[in-house]
């Protein structure tokens, strides 16, 4: 296809060629222009013309009506722009610019324009070097000479090209400048800038330079809306400037996430033809919305994911069902609590003393707490049973408890504190650490006789708290000290706060102490004390302090001025449903202590502790068969490691303490008989609390605080319950063959509590001893009336209470020939008084 050149353009090129040929210094034409070529070099013979074109590429030979001819015309327009020489070809020039253009064109023609001369290299000459390629030009070869470059400078025909564009100089027209040859376009650009928009030489004083090129001020504008971009922001697209608005509307990408334009100022993420805003909300996982910035991602079906689970539509942190998710949540929480406890226990052991001091000070209640409200709350809290609390135990782990392992807890609690706690539990350790390691653990603290009395009240309570997993356990409050706590100078500095039980699944897996729990309390009178009791000066004082001791162990020294108490762990009750019931009414199903009766006198707890031991020998089997109903308090108890389960005179002999006194039955609470509501054996005399509002107990807290000072100088007596428990335990060990378990429980001094310790063995073997049903406090007496006054004020008496006289106690215990020392610690003090044999209580 032949493109016909417009007539006007053809006349223009012909005129330009005439002007260039007239002003050039080339040789004269040969006069024999060949008709087959559109243009031939002037002054050559026909054979020389063929020789010249034979040196050029075939596609560039300007045969008539050939591609070479079209290339020639194109190169003439490109290398010799008409608007560089003629004003009429320029679009918008003012008069000054027109004058400059004429001067510029005439100067170039006069100083730089020329045409190459093609002739054979003389044979007589040895040869020459091509200026462009450096090749040899031999004699007789066709060479191109440029008169402006000098007579000795020559080129091969294909090497006569522009220095800038390396294109053959059309019709051998060149412009010489500084020893180099140029085409007309690039020579003009060496002298003046050319506008990238209109392709004209810029003769104005100002221009815009951008992207390495130059524009007229008015020509640098948006290619779409023609807005002048001088001094403005622009975007180049395919060599054309665009304003920001036009570029966004024409070329901006859409975000695959939010379907909005990705602005030029916004970061962009691109993958496989997709585009996203470079933000965490857009470039994120399509399933879980996790940010993928700087992270590997998984493309799938036009979306990106963070993992294979998300690409499959699964929840990587979820479970298969809601039921398993609930169970897993509890299991994970339990393991987390256990792991935190073990790890923290390892790190806190070097700083035990400092930590214990901090715990004592941090757990004390502020002085602005209402004592009456506090005591009422304590009573209500301690009476809660697991069946009334619907919160599972794993939810109560959110409280800021201080966890620790069992070895650390053994050195952070006082036996006197923990014996009165309502949730004490001891672990059954069948392994080597169960019986052999515990005496060694306690030996380092009790080997020194000078320290034994004070260490008896130091912190060694951790062994009580062997964690047990029970889903229906009530949530427990962290123990606190009462509002009137004061540090005793004779106490050990290692006494810490009571630790809340935690789960021990990790220990169970690692082969530590067994987490199989003994859920019944061990009766105090069935244990053998293997260390000295605390002195009287360090024991709690005040008869009404049984209110605090029923919920937390109170330690009073120096006449009650320096008293330290620890609140035990409680379960929150529904106060609206208690109807004024006192501490352990719901917990008295298994013969637990009646807290409301203990507040009656200064030593009311002692008789209950000695009498309750025969009523707490069954627990675990009943709990297993009835796990959701009202649970006995025994299920929360544990034996301290300082108790020695001995077949000897268990619970009745205290080394080094002869002046021990047991309070009369008038000072001890009596329990009303109640019947079991289950399908097992019935015990005719069960403990049941009388309904008495907890406010009545709290109101008399101050009046009975010093009642214990009157009861210090009484002669020692023995308790019948101690000897009965000794006979029972020895017959039990002989029948069961478990005499080797005497060291299963450690040593601990006697203390008082409204809540009895549980017998871990009795809970497991309770059905074997169910026939030993008896009660030591079912007799009546009026002797308590003599004790009912303190400082001239009557001590409030609970309704429907009966007390056993001291004569009855003496009658009950005189026939057993008990040793002179009896270890029944009531209200934390040691007292001894002769008792009469009970008139009404007999052994069944």
UniProtKB/Swiss-Prot annotation:
List the transmembrane segments: none
**Positions carrying Phosphoserine:** 92, 319, 321-322, 543, 546, 607, 642, 731
Listed GO molecular functions?
zinc ion binding
Q: Which residues form the propeptide?
A: 842-844
Cellular compartment(s): Nucleus membrane
Q: Where is the LIM zinc-binding domain?
A: 128-193, 193-253, 253-317
Bias type Polar residues, positions = 318-327
Give any Pfam family that matches: PET
Low complexity bias spans: 481-493
Sorted alphabetically, the keyword list is: Disease variant, Epilepsy, LIM domain, Lipoprotein, Membrane, Metal-binding, Methylation, Neurodegeneration, Neuropathy, Nucleus, Phosphoprotein, Prenylation, Repeat, Zinc
Q: Where is the lipid attached (S-farnesyl cysteine)?
A: 841
Q: Which SUPFAM superfamilies match?
A: Glucocorticoid receptor-like (DNA-binding domain)
Cysteine methyl ester: which positions carry it? 841
For the PET domain, which residue ranges apply? 18-126
Q: Which InterPro entries match?
A: LIM1_prickle, LIM2_prickle, LIM3_prickle, PET_domain, PET_prickle, Pk/Esn/Tes, Znf_LIM
- Its chief place of residence is nucleus
Bias regions of kind Basic residues — which residues? 682-692
Similarity comment: Belongs to the prickle / espinas / testin family.
Database matches in PANTHER family: LIM DOMAIN-CONTAINING PROTEIN, PRICKLE-LIKE PROTEIN 2
Q: What protein is this chain from?
A: Prickle-like protein 2
| Species of origin | Homo sapiens
């Amino acid at each position: 296809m032949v493109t016909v050149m417009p007539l006007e353009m053809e006349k223009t090129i012909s005129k330009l060629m005439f002007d260039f040929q007239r002003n050039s210094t080339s040789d004269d034409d040969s006069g024999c222009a060949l008709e087959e070529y559109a243009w031939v070099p002037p002054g050559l013979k026909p054979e020389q013309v063929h020789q010249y074109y034979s040196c050029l590429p075939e596609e560039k030979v300007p045969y008539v009506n050939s591609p070479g001819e079209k290339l020639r015309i194109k190169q003439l327009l490109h290398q010799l722009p008409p608007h560089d020489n003629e004003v009429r070809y320029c679009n918008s020039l003012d008069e000054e610019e027109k004058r400059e253009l004429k001067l510029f064109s005439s100067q170039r023609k006069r100083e730089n324009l020329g045409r190459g001369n093609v002739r054979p290299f003389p044979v007589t000459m040895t040869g020459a070097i091509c200026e462009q390629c450096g090749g040899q030009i031999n004699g007789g070869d066709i060479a191109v000479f440029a008169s402006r470059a000098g007579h000795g400078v020559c080129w091969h025909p294909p090497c006569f090209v522009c220095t800038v564009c390396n294109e053959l100089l059309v019709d051998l027209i060149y412009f010489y400048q500084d020893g180099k040859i140029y085409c007309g376009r690039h020579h003009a650009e060496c002298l003046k800038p050319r506008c990238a928009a209109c392709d004209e030489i810029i003769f104005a004083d100002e221009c815009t330079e951008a992207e390495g090129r130059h524009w007229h001020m008015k020509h640098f504008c948006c290619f779409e809306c023609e807005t002048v971009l001088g001094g403005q922001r622009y975007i180049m697209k395919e060599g054309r400037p665009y304003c920001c608005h036009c570029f966004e509307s024409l070329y901006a990408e859409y975000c695959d996430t939010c379907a909005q334009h990705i602005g030029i100022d916004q970061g962009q993420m691109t993958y496989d033809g997709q585009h996203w805003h470079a933000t965490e909300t857009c470039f994120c996982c399509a399933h879980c919305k996790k940010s993928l910035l700087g992270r590997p991602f998984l493309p799938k079906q036009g979306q990106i994911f963070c993992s294979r689970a998300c690409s499959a539509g699964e929840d990587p942190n979820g479970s298969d069902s809601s039921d398993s998710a609930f169970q897993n949540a509890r299991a994970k929480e339990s393991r987390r609590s256990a792991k935190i406890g073990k790890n923290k226990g390892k790190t806190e052991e070097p700083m035990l003393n400092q930590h214990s001091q901090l715990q004592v000070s941090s757990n004390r209640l502020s002085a602005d707490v209402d004592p009456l409200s506090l005591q009422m709350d304590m009573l209500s809290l301690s009476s809660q049973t697991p069946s009334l609390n619907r919160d599972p135990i794993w939810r109560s782990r959110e409280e800021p408890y201080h966890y620790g392992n069992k070895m650390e807890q053994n050195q952070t609690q006082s036996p006197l504190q923990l014996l009165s706690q309502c949730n004490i539990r001891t672990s059954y350790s069948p392994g080597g650490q169960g019986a052999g390691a515990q005496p060694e653990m306690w030996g380092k603290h009790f080997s020194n006789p000078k320290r034994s009395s004070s260490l008896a009240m130091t912190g060694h309570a951790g062994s009580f708290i062997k964690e047990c997993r029970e889903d229906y356990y009530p949530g427990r409050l962290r123990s606190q000290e009462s509002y009137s706590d004061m540090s005793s100078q004779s106490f050990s500095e290692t006494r810490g706060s009571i630790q809340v039980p935690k789960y021990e699944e990790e220990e169970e897996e690692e082969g530590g102490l067994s987490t199989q729990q003994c859920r019944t309390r061990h009766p105090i009178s069935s244990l053998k004390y293997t260390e000295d009791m605390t002195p009287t000066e360090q024991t709690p004082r005040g008869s009404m302090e049984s209110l605090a001791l029923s919920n937390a162990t109170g330690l009073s020294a120096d006449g009650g001025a320096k008293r330290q108490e620890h609140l035990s762990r409680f379960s929150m009750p529904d106060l609206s449903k208690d109807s004024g019931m006192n501490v352990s009414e719901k917990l008295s199903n298994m013969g637990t202590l009646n807290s409301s009766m203990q507040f009656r006198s200064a030593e009311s707890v002692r008789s209950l502790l000695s009498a309750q031991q025969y009523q707490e020998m069954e627990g675990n089997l009943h709990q297993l068969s009835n796990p959701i109903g009202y649970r006995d308090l025994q299920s929360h108890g544990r034996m301290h490691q300082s108790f020695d389960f001995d077949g000897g005179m268990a619970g009745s002999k205290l080394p080094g303490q002869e002046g021990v006194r047991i309070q009369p039955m008038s000072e001890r609470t009596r329990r009303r008989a109640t019947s079991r509501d289950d399908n097992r054996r019935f015990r005719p005399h069960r403990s049941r609390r009388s309904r008495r509002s907890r406010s009545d107990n709290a109101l008399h807290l101050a009046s009975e605080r010093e009642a214990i000072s009157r009861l210090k100088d009484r002669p020692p007596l023995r308790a019948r319950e101690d000897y009965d428990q000794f006979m029972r335990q020895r017959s039990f060990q002989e029948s069961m063959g478990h005499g080797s378990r005497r060291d299963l429980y450690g040593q601990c001094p006697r203390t008082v509590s409204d809540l009895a310790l549980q017998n871990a063995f009795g809970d497991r073997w309770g059905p074997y001893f169910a026939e030993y049903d008896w009660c030591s406090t079912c007799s009546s007496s009026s002797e308590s009336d003599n004790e009912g006054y303190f400082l001239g004020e009557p001590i409030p008496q609970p309704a429907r209470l009966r007390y056993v006289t001291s004569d009855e106690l003496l009658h009950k215990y005189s026939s057993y020939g008990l040793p002179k020392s009896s270890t029944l610690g009531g209200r934390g003090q040691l007292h001894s008084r002769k008792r009469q044999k009970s008139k009404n209580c007999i052994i069944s």
